[in-house]
């Protein structure tokens, strides 16, 4: 969280250990992170597998038409997908597995109109450079799906 700086939020994802979601999300908050999605019912999350079955602009337009008060996040993995959805009324662009140069370019294009989020293969070595692109938040799945154990012992 400290590596990302004060302007960029670190978020966990929906990927949690079965039956431990509430506890893991609480632990993220205690550690200074943010919970922005508890599950898929919180918002429309349009991912690459949805887009593969349709034109990205058409799919996002359909979600906008049926959103019923929920926010919409659209995952893009290249700048062409981003350009295709610009101008549509949704909430967040999720840049997935993009290299730093493309991420920086994407944030520059989208930042005025949408919240921005980066995700995919982000770790302690890369989080600072990802935050420096200007994204609003970074979601890191390994916070909840692959937590490391602490060495805790009690000696008497």
Language-model segments: what does each one mean?
Residues 1-88, 92, 101-109, 113-118, ...:
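Acidic/glycine-rich phosphate/pyrophosphate-binding loops and surrounding catalytic core
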Residues 97, 120, 142:
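Short secondary-structure boundary segments
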Residues 124:
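Cys/His-rich Zn2+-binding cysteine-cluster or related metal-binding knuckle/ribbon modules and their
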Residues 153-156:
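Active-site loop ensemble at the mouth of alpha/beta enzyme cores that anchors a bound cofactor
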